[in-house]
Amino acid sequence: MALLDVCGAPRGQRPESALPVAGSGRRSDPGHYSFSMRSPELALPRGMQPTEFFQSLGGDGERNVQIEMAHGTTTLAFKFQHGVIAAVDSRASAGSYISALRVNKVIEINPYLLGTMSGCAADCQYWERLLAKECRLYYLRNGERISVSAASKLLSNMMCQYRGMGLSMGSMICGWDKKGPGLYYVDEHGTRLSGNMFSTGSGNTYAYGVMDSGYRPNLSPEEAYDLGRRAIAYATHRDSYSGGVVNMYHMKEDGWVKVESTDVSDLLHQYREANQ
């Protein structure tokens, strides 16, 4: 197999099956959730449950220790006649502390699929990269790209299996397949919604206000860029947990392209001067 050659496995050596052999008493241990098995297993970290672990470090007065997860963001995506626009900010915060100024909150799953990040950065990055692996395996097995609907369903199924275990994720899956542009919202509870416009994160209410006032299905590409740019910029102005730069992607029929990465402070100055 090509994968064995890439991994450097000796030729002629038969790999062991990941499935347990009947009557052997041996259990598989894939180390992660895998859709390649007929009876997939969930490999949880050995030890206490994640929710109990975080509660034990919640600052109870005796330990006075608290874990602040990286969170706080504004992401948006909407469909229009020329594809899908995905725009995000770049600030990551842990509690009241700004932990990073330039975080890429768009996961490039493959040339025809994008995923946005909101919630816990570690959860979003891990599960969307795992989704990218499954999408690649689907292509190798079937000889065609996975649909946007199927990719979002895979992510939703993963979240359902880990429901109630302390995950924090709100993601939008954007892509283009045989049916045209697709946009889905998936969160840590396994919720999966299809729509024309979504926004997630702590600044989503401000972004929705701008998008609702300017969204039309027949927007031109430049009008769509300006709408996404303004929505993120004004959301970062009102939401202290959002900021940095506007990273914008355009999903087209021939794949996604990165439109721009513009500082929100410069955009707000431009808008203020234009209104004077």
Swiss-Prot record:
Keyword Nucleus: yes
Catalytic activity: Cleavage of peptide bonds with very broad specificity
Signal peptide segment: none
Active site (catalytic residues): T73
GO biological process: antigen processing and presentation; fat cell differentiation; proteasome-mediated ubiquitin-dependent protein catabolic process
Region of interest (Disordered), ranges: 1-33
Keywords, alphabetical: Cytoplasm, Differentiation, Disease variant, Host-virus interaction, Hydrolase, Immunity, Nucleus, Phosphoprotein, Protease, Proteasome, Threonine protease, Zymogen
Localisation per UniProt entry: Cytoplasm; Nucleus
Keyword Nucleotide-binding: no
Induction remarks: Up-regulated by IFNG/IFN-gamma and IRF1 (at protein level). Up-regulated by TNF (at protein level). Up-regulated by tetrodotoxin (TTX) in glial cells. Up-regulated in Crohn's bowel disease (CD). Down-regulated by the selective inhibitor PR-957. Down-regulated in mature dendritic cells by HSV-1 infection. Up-regulated by heat shock treatment.
Effect caused by changing G8R: In allele LMP7C
Gene Ontology molecular function: endopeptidase activity; threonine-type endopeptidase activity
Top-level division of the source organism's lineage: Eukaryota
Propeptide: 1-72
This protein's GO CC annotations: cytosol; extracellular exosome; nucleoplasm; nucleus; proteasome complex; proteasome core complex; proteasome core complex, beta-subunit complex; spermatoproteasome complex
Broad EC category: hydrolase
Pfam families, per the entry: Proteasome
Residues flagged as site, Cleavage: G72, T73
Quaternary structure and partners: The 26S proteasome consists of a 20S proteasome core and two 19S regulatory subunits. The 20S proteasome core is composed of 28 subunits that are arranged in four stacked rings, resulting in a barrel-shaped structure. The two end rings are each formed by seven alpha subunits, and the two central rings are each formed by seven beta subunits. The catalytic chamber with the active sites is on the inside of the barrel. Component of the immunoproteasome, where it displaces the equivalent housekeeping subunit PSMB5. (Microbial infection) Interacts with HIV-1 TAT protein.
Function description: The proteasome is a multicatalytic proteinase complex which is characterized by its ability to cleave peptides with Arg, Phe, Tyr, Leu, and Glu adjacent to the leaving group at neutral or slightly basic pH. The proteasome has an ATP-dependent proteolytic activity. This subunit is involved in antigen processing to generate class I binding peptides. Replacement of PSMB5 by PSMB8 increases the capacity of the immunoproteasome to cleave model peptides after hydrophobic and basic residues.
Disease note: Proteasome-associated autoinflammatory syndrome 1: An autosomal recessive autoinflammatory disorder characterized by early childhood onset of recurrent fever, joint stiffness and severe contractures of the hands and feet, and erythematous skin lesions with subsequent development of lipodystrophy and laboratory evidence of immune dysregulation. Accompanying features may include muscle weakness and atrophy, hepatosplenomegaly, and microcytic anemia.
Assigned protein family: Belongs to the peptidase T1B family.
Protein name: Proteasome subunit beta type-8
